[in-house]
């Protein structure tokens, strides 16, 4: 990949981030939600991954005291298969540690085996199940976590 950068999300990135969101998720977040997260949520940290100044993915992280939670992570479908998700996830984990996180957790669809495999590479293990967690199809979510 040519010029790859991972950096904090800025308000001016939201349009491109929403484009990724719409391409990836059946029930995408709105511009307003991203604005609130980036501009107003003091516990939230969002990052973008860009190639040649084009945003191709993003990740969200909340850190409350020493508890870190991945809120979302997405890579544009046309950029999958290049390990960008791993790069972005690893960077986000490093930021969680830097921000004082001692534990990291996330939810992942039961059907998303590829994501579960990637999270396991980073040491996350299943810790529970949230029944009917996803509103689009009532799919269960596996809660995964790791000590940082």
Regions found by a protein language model. Name each.
Residues 76-78, 82, 110-112:
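Active-site acidic-Proline motif in GNAT/NAT acetyltransferases
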Residues 8-78, 89-91, 95, 99, ...:
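Acetyl-CoA-dependent GNAT
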Residues 70, 104-108:
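Conserved hydrophobic beta-strand within the GNAT/NAT acetyltransferase core sheet
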Residues 81-94, 117-121:
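Conserved acetyl-CoA-binding loop-helix of GNAT-fold acetyltransferases
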Residues 3-5:
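Extreme N-terminal starter segment of soluble prokaryotic enzymes
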Residues 85, 89, 111-115, 132-137:
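Short glycine/proline-centered loop/turn elements that form peptide/ligand docking sites
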Residues 107, 120, 125-142:
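Conserved catalytic-core motifs of GNAT/GCN5-like acyltransferases
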């Amino acid at each position: 990949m040519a010029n790859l950068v991972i950096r904090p999300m800025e308000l001016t990135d939201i349009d491109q981030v929403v484009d990724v969101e719409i391409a990836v998720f059946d029930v995408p977040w709105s511009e307003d939600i991203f604005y609130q997260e980036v501009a107003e949520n003091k516990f939230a940290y969002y990052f973008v991954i860009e190639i040649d100044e084009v945003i191709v993915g993003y990740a969200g992280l909340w850190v409350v005291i020493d508890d870190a939670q991945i809120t979302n992570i997405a890579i544009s479908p046309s950029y999958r298969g290049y390990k960008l998700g791993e790069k972005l996830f690893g960077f986000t984990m490093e930021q969680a540690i830097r921000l004082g996180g001692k534990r990291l957790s996330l939810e992942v669809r039961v059907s998303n085996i590829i994501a579960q495999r990637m999270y396991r590479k980073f040491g996350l293990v299943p810790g529970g199940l949230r029944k009917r967690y996803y509103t689009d199809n009532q799919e269960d979510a596996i809660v995964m976590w790791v000590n940082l």
